[in-house]
């Protein structure tokens, strides 16, 4: 991200975290915390906090672009080497992304003139790429998340919470104890394959499980299997901001989800300087931008487009 843009968006993120309600586990002292700073491609890891107040104080001094805690519990979560942490068990995770569920349209723009192109190269430079996610696509992914949640309950007796990722997908999390927590990667791989490649011996509509589902036309679900298998996975903290879009990571309750501007916490308007010339669709609204021509736009939209690399936020007014 551009340094000037970073400064403004970092201020917005910092102001958000002053009052943000982060949904933290009751055993947070057993979790490893991590974050990605602004202007850095690497994570700061092996952090440990004993209270929400201690965490908030830290992130106000070190504003995160992305903020995580571990799905695993550890005896020594701040140990620098993974083998020294003392693994005590992990939650069970599922990750759904629009790329795996929908045919996502990827648009390319040449940085020299901002115009859309079909080429993979613009006079020796890579094009600006923007995956345009539709509301229809997000809702399809949400339907798959609900299906996974229901299957976990019906077939395994497990209760999963669903979270919007803050970008273009959903996470499901089963808080595990005892046998569930101690599942090893091979066990978790079998569970992942149960969802992606169901193979019931008999297909009959009246049967429970995948036998009945396949008979009704329900197919296996494309999930990121590595997320489910990994016992040391970092997960986004509910209530944090996803630095790829500036949207909040939120829990979905009562099976209801609306993909819209409310997912961004920012108020007011901003001056947005586009890098591209195009008509862009976001949250079912269309925005026309022209390269190097500043426009006044809703800050929620400006931050989203800036984090997608389509321009920069020059100023904002509450």
Curated annotation (Swiss-Prot):
GO cellular component: DNA-directed RNA polymerase complex; primosome complex
Coiled-coil annotated residue ranges, if any: none
Top-level EC class: transferase
GO terms classed as biological process: DNA replication, synthesis of primer
Molecular function per GO: DNA-directed RNA polymerase activity; metal ion binding
UniProt signal peptide: none
Keywords associated with the record: DNA replication, DNA-directed RNA polymerase, Magnesium, Manganese, Metal-binding, Nucleotidyltransferase, Primosome, Transcription, Transferase
Keyword Nucleotidyltransferase: yes
UniProt xrefs under InterPro entries: DNA_primase_ssu_euk/arc, DNA_primase_ssu_PriS
Transmembrane segments: none
Family: Belongs to the eukaryotic-type primase small subunit family.
Role of this protein: Catalytic subunit of DNA primase, an RNA polymerase that catalyzes the synthesis of short RNA molecules used as primers for DNA polymerase during DNA replication. The small subunit contains the primase catalytic core and has DNA synthesis activity on its own. Binding to the large subunit stabilizes and modulates the activity, increasing the rate of DNA synthesis while decreasing the length of the DNA fragments, and conferring RNA synthesis capability. The DNA polymerase activity may enable DNA primase to also catalyze primer extension after primer synthesis. May also play a role in DNA repair.
Official protein name in the record: DNA primase small subunit PriS
Organism name: Sulfurisphaera tokodaii (strain DSM 16993 / JCM 10545 / NBRC 100140 / 7) (Sulfolobus tokodaii)
Gene that encodes the chain: priS
